[in-house]
Amino acid sequence: PVRDGRYGPDERYPMVLQSLLGPGWAVAEEGLPGRTAVFDDPITEGMNGLRLINPILMSHAPLDTVTIMLGTNDCKARFACDSYQIAQGIARLTKKALQTECWRDNAHPDVLVIVPPVITPAYDRLIFREEMGPGCHERCAGIAARLAPMLQGLPGVRFLDANTLPGAVCSPVDGMHMTKEAHRALAQGLYRELTASV
């Protein structure tokens, strides 16, 4: 987190990943602060990933792999959902990505679903406590265990819990955004995952 905006492109994990992968790969970044997996935000317009994923993917087609890391913003108290319902939303979004006609040479889809780092319990004493509302840590902490079985057996879907990657943690500044070091740790984990079968 930075107080006057976002990290620069070369500091965020997609472009760090690009630097690790090298010139044989092209990473397209589509991050948006506040985006949800499936919820329309009554306060901030245009945040529903389910409504946007088709045109986003088609704008970058043809694609070999799609990565999805959402869920943090779905934990906001105003959506009144628990971890199971948030996981259901991510699973629904994943299925829509699989069905989008964006894949190179009509190849089999390859979607890597990433569970984001868990919001720390201290977030409710920090700068986003009013924006997020109560109970976010608990909801966020439960996503991985509920999402994994929902995705198991889906052809073309891989699962990665960022919380299993050393250093991929939320910042003590706000308890919910990653530090530069965490972005690099996540990029390194994604590099290992994406190149393991190459």
What are the residue ranges of the model-derived segments?
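Serine-esterase "nucleophile elbow" of acetyl-processing enzymes
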Residues: P1-L32, V38-I43, P55-M58, V66, ...
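Alpha-helical cap/lid subdomain in secreted, periplasmic
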Residues: P23, M47-V198
